[in-house]
């Protein structure tokens, strides 16, 4: 298929006439010949990764969507006739399939699924969609693997149509007929709709709005393809695990296009890393000024919603109702992504100076050589069908474990690898399906202390409790569904992972990327003495943006000012070496650029977390004590770089365990001694106590008592575990690092 490359002449003769974004562009410079050559090289580099679909396959998708669209129209006519609508209405009743996501954006890859939306008039009910339309799909020869998920947060029908996976949502509009030229961006369409229809419409509305807010769609698409591939190769593409999903990456690329409206893909990729390695999080990324439609729908607004002030990396969807697409981002995942942005900037600097090729940007660093300590999570189920359900649930809650680990006073970073792996069987004679995730840990370096005792038992058990509670209440729990956790050192990973996964990668050049300190301690990510490669690892590169002058008088515990204010400041980016060659952005100019950001969203520095004692019981899961209510205003100290994050005001705080109680309870666990690591490999002595993971049946009398039970941070509306016996995995992970 053709790959459009905007030429120098066309950009100069047809500059964008519109003003895009909430600020003025940083540069209007037109591309040079070297930029066009670099863009062509970028395309050639991307091709082997399968990011471009062949024209034949694209036409096949169009044909399938056409058949699906005809089925929808036919079905709606049948429904209309069954409900005795006038013939004049039936003839023009319409109905339509819309697409959204990567396919609608034009950046889908080979074999990717299609996200679709079925839009119907007001006399067609959601129940019709999940009954008569489902039955109609079942009769189609091309349709395989048909299944309905009616109880999902966004109800969906999933199917495989002639080999293409399709997810179909449903929305009923308050219209008598559905015209062919219907524009879903019209906010008036949301009137009198139920919340499920609004959620279903949101994907299409956001996708269409993004495409209308970029200066050049072809340049946007090619840049987004490159950034998505880079994010996937660097294991930071996963909304569910606290990184960014497809729509978030699309909005970041769209904002870059707005700031450099005449630039082409090679320049835009470089500017993407420049802008977001300098971004003053948690200032929000906005593609347009939020608009109020007076429909009383909840929108992202830190002035109104206290929890919105605690979002760490807000990227706001442009369509009403505006939402933060990155609410899952944690301290650790933001640190990882910011460090990757910095490394991306260093590499693209080299590329623009002809010191490196594009392939270097897409080299995948080896996650399993980054850290000395890892937590391995194992999820197992007796059948493949149960494994799929169980793995989906466990994966959706891993971010809760990461959040709990990073609040531990001894942990600097908890980095989960978005990839899951098949786990070795526990017994070759037993049929069992197991999936494994790996979390890299960096422990805080302590000064004036010889010993560092770390007890992760509570963090693991709290996570396990949350997953089991969700499984039981969703009626998917089976007795043989298990979760296990273990601590392993880097050199022990070969016992769990295949050799090709652990293969060492070529060392990246990261000249100009400096690792910063967190909590006045450097990150201990050095390699074992026998390891020859070194991959720069995430650090606390994040910087807390100061309060602006207008907000300083309000006090830190007052609501955050409006992000919709028209005033925007230009925050001067720190100095960066901009390549002198092959750059269309004034190579002879200053070495720093002004990155426009919304200065009306100040950084909210949360209060330091308290240390609360906790006791590990040998007969039941440990549950946190109720956290103090966050409704009362709390005076927050001045911003501190790297301060430990607390939960949102309306959430509970995880208690900490004192050293005394840790020593007392260590006698209750059956521990397995393993060796560990310290910074100095030749002098380290690490006593690791890891209790064997046991499956216990907790009797009703010893089960979680309601009076002791508090809700999870993610499941505040879920009741306590039932009194009947259930298997509970005991996970005791205790480490004593002797320095």
Curated annotation (Swiss-Prot):
Q: Which cofactor does it need?
A: Mg(2+); Mn(2+)
Q: Where is the composition biased (Basic and acidic residues)?
A: 650-660, 676-686
According to the UniProt record, list the residues that bear N6-acetyllysine.
635, 644, 730, 734
What's in the GO CC field?
nucleoplasm
**Enzyme Commission number:** 2.7.7.19
Q: What does this protein do?
A: Polymerase that creates the 3'-poly(A) tail of mRNA's. Also required for the endoribonucleolytic cleavage reaction at some polyadenylation sites. May acquire specificity through interaction with a cleavage and polyadenylation specificity factor (CPSF) at its C-terminus.
List the protein's name: Poly(A) polymerase alpha
Where are the bilayer-spanning segments?
A: none
Where does the record place the site Interaction with RNA? 153, 158, 328, 399, 524
In this chain, the stretch annotated as Ser/Thr-rich covers: 508-643
Annotated motif Nuclear localization signal 2, positions: 644-659
